[in-house]
Amino acid sequence: KYATIAATPEEADVIVLKFGTPFTPVEDPKFFLERIFHQGRLDFPEAKKREMLKLINTKPTISIFTMNRPAVIPEINTGSSALIVDFECQDEILAELIFGKFNPTGKLPIEMPSSVKAVEDQLEDVPHDSKDPLYQFGFGLEYQKNNN
């Protein structure tokens, strides 16, 4: 509907990667909420991160993160040509966004930390206090309008 899907990254003009927020699986949850909400690490394991960065460094890349909590992704952010954060929207909406079918607007309802250390050092009961966040609470961009 929008583009031709390439068989390999080498054949692609642009790579679109979609990820969920990293988390640590709980094998035997003791509490009801552990069955529903992700917890644990906010960064990807090194092997997974290397795999992602290898693709990102191959071609221009649009990285899409479906988030249910903040993620520590500075290397992915730096390597990506574009970074899109969504909160459980449909893939068709993301395709329409990428192909310019509408002018997106939105603001982050969370702060995106710049490192695991920044997460560890921040206070649990104080909002928006991490050191040098990758993206601050309320950050948002939109496409520039074409007046032609």
Describe the predicted segments one by one:
Residues 1-148:
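C-terminal non-catalytic regions of proteins with extracellular/luminal or membrane-system context
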